Regions:
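Generic structural motif recognizing short loop/turn segments at the entrances and edges of beta-strands
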Residues: 15-17, 35, 41-44, 77, ...
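Structural recognition of the beta-strand scaffold that forms the well-ordered cores
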Residues: 1, 19, 46-47, 122-126
Length: 160
């Protein structure tokens, strides 16, 4: 498990992550809607975590930004791995203060390179209804058929 405090240091280790900003970020002088920016420092964390004051304030937009960030981060990470074969080990060492794991540095390095080189052409989405409860908290009620499809895709293999 890696906690959210790792976003900034790991983002900056890859030299920043290039994304197009698709939401308004009130109060930010660097995250400007419509601009392509290189996320550095706290801007990276703001981009992936902020919700309430950004765009429509709903979680769906934040999840879309997280997907955009994930794809761009993987590209930057993979590039760094190709430039420096020890880069995954450097990331592992940096993450020590932010993670709890039982995998070794060598295992992490192998997994990190696999993750970075994996094709992100398949995204699974559970459809459903968004709303708010009586206390004003955002809710999501998954469509049962959509949820079942995602479960089958993730956890089962088709027989041939």
């Amino acid at each position: 498990m890696v906690n959210m405090g790792a976003i900034v240091p790991v983002n900056d280790m890859v030299g920043g992550v290039i994304v197009k900003v698709t939401d308004e970020f009130p109060g930010s002088k660097t995250l400007i809607k419509g601009k392509t920016v290189t996320l550095k420092g706290n801007d990276a964390e703001t981009f992936v975590r902020e919700r309430k004051d950004v765009g429509d304030g709903l979680n769906d937009n934040r999840m879309k930004r997280q997907q955009v960030y994930e794809v761009a981060f993987k590209q930057a990470f993979y590039k760094k791995c190709n430039e420096n074969k020890k880069f995954p080990l450097e990331v592992y060492n940096t993450l020590q203060d932010y993670m709890t794991t039982n995998i070794t540095a060598q295992q992490f390095s192998k997994l990190a390179v696999l993750m970075a080189s994996a094709k992100a052409d398949t995204k699974l989405t559970v459809k459903g209804k968004e709303g708010f409860d009586d206390d004003g908290w955002q809710t999501f009620t998954p469509d049962k058929d959509s949820l079942k499809q995602v479960e089958l895709e993730l956890f089962y293999k088709k027989q041939k």
